[in-house]
């Protein structure tokens, strides 16, 4: 197998020497790009778009044509697994995901399908294979999934929410039923990520977007324990190469040490956590990813550069940092501000003194 021409991102995740801090952007393929909006016009239905491998591949590649990013992330959605399980999923243009048959009882959980993922989600794996071929080993490709807790939030609530009160109440009212749902989601997520790796993903990431809504005790029981199970069962080596695993729990800074001990290689931080303090807290256990506030990208290039440099300085010297936002980029972000961010990170490189012997050579 040919080595990656740019393995900076993977090296940083594995805390190996790098020449500069790698950078990519959560939701880097999306509505802030005019070419993406034009592409979406071909298939207005979002899930139908995701299920068209050629379009998903093109959307994945678009940001790399504009910006010298150090990784690509496959264009998809975290709700592909619930969709494959038989929930009646609809993506409303102004509302977001709506599930018309929410899962709120043991009977509802028992009715969920457990399909072979390589068949039910073949479109995603086809998109990965197309993208790997198109990338031609230029940069690594990230595969991803939603955390079981985050997927369960949507499935039980029936739609997006700032509080997911229905989901949280169900933890107290029907904990055994909720655990059964989470275990089903965990089983499928493991198979899903492994199939993405088989198709060609170089890195996999779990988005625990709503983990920060939980109490410390409930976070461990209903989110982190399942993330740890995934970490233990996802393929971590392929053809002699390590496959790094990233966990991102939004508003999860208070549990940073626990997340670092869960079996992942890197922890994503949102913008509410100081990255320098986070580095001191986790030591050399994991790499860190983040953590610029996406809102600053709505300001001006000078403010963006200052904030980015502050984060780079706060992390300090040495490898183990992947620069990213603290959450997904806002659709209204000006293109020139993204360019300013990427340029700043590339130009402000705190180099290692160690010689760089590529992991892939």
Curated annotation (Swiss-Prot):
Homodimer. Its main location: cytoplasm. It comes from the Bacteria. It is found in: Cytoplasm. Catalyzes the decarboxylation of four acetate groups of uroporphyrinogen-III to yield coproporphyrinogen-III. GO terms for biological process: protoporphyrinogen IX biosynthetic process from glutamate. It catalyses: uroporphyrinogen III + 4 H(+) = coproporphyrinogen III + 4 CO2. Belongs to the uroporphyrinogen decarboxylase family. Substrate binds at residues 27-31, 77, 154, 209, 327. One of its GO terms (cellular component) is cytosol. Disulfide bonds: none annotated. One of its GO terms (molecular function) is uroporphyrinogen decarboxylase activity. HAMAP family: URO_D (MF_00218). This is Uroporphyrinogen decarboxylase. Its EC number is 4.1.1.37. Keywords: Cytoplasm, Decarboxylase, Lyase, Porphyrin biosynthesis. Pfam families: URO-D (PF01208). It is an enzyme of class 4 (lyase). Pathway: Porphyrin-containing compound metabolism; protoporphyrin-IX biosynthesis; coproporphyrinogen-III from 5-aminolevulinate: step 4/4. The record marks 77 as: Transition state stabilizer.
């Amino acid at each position: 197998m040919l080595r990656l021409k740019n393995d900076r991102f993977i090296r940083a995740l594995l805390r190996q020497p790098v020449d500069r801090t790698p950078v990519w952007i959560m939701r880097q393929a999306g509505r802030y790009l005019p070419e993406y909006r034009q592409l979406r016009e071909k298939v207005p239905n979002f899930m139908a778009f995701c299920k068209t491998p050629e379009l998903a591949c093109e959307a994945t590649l678009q940001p790399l044509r504009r910006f010298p990013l150090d990784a690509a992330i496959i264009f998809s959605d975290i709700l592909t697994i619930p969709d494959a399980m038989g929930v009646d999923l609809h993506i409303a243009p102004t509302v977001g995901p709506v599930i018309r048959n929410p899962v709120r009882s043991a009977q509802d959980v028992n009715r969920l399908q457990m399909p072979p993922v390589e068949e039910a989600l073949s479109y995603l794996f086809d998109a990965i294979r197309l993208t790997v071929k198109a990338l031609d080993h230029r940069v690594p490709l990230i595969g991803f999934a939603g955390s079981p807790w985050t997927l369960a939030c949507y499935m039980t609530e029936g739609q997006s929410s700032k509080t997911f009160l229905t989901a949280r109440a169900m933890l107290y009212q029907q904990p055994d039923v909720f655990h059964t749902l989470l275990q089903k989601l965990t089983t499928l997520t493991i198979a899903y990520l492994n199939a993405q790796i088989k198709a060609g993903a170089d890195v996999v990431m779990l988005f625990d977007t709503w983990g920060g809504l939980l109490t410390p005790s409930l976070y461990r029981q209903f989110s982190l324990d399942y993330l740890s199970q995934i970490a233990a069962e996802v393929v971590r080596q392929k053809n002699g190469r390590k496959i790094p695993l990233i966990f991102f729990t939004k508003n999860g800074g208070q549990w940073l040490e626990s997340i670092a001990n869960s079996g992942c290689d890197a922890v994503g931080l949102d913008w509410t956590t100081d990255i320098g303090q986070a580095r001191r807290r986790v030591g050399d256990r994991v790499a860190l990813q983040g953590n610029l506030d996406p809102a600053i990208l709505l300001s001006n290039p000078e403010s963006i550069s200052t904030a980015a440099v502050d984060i780079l300085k706060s992390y300090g010297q040495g490898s183990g940092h992947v620069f990213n936002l603290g959450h997904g980029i806002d659709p209204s972000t000006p293109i020139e501000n993204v360019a300013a961010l990427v340029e700043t990170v590339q130009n402000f490189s705190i180099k290692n003194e160690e010689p760089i012997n590529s992991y892939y050579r």
